[in-house]
Amino acid sequence: MTDGAEACPGASKVKSKKAKVKSELSMKENDLKDRLFQFAIGVLKMLGNLKVAKETDVIKYQLSKSATSSGANYEESQAAVSKADFINKVGISLKEMRESNYWLRIIKELFPKTENIVYLVGESEELGKILASILIKSRN
């Protein structure tokens, strides 16, 4: 008995292309996971250096939760048990990123000289767009 590759000469090329596409998708997923992780670390470091004041305590608490939750929910989406579960987790990740962007913009407005704040606001916007794109494509 022969395997499919011997029966169809072009089969190995097709398998090779599929493996390459899958590998590229996996690398993109890892890039996003890494970016979400680094975003959370960057936010936590920035918050550690932020002025201690009564009015910033709530912002610091909320931002630390939303910035870390976005990555955590995306990680959970990678082990989803169904398409609906995947969409739900990515949707939560997007909502948390949008919340992070909101808190970061408040910090930027109140404390414009905060180290890395411009970068973090921009990164939250980019990550939000990526997550929204994944969500839209997953729903189709």
Describe the residue ranges of each PLM region.
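Short, C-terminally biased terminal segments at protein or domain edges
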Residues: 1-76, 80-140
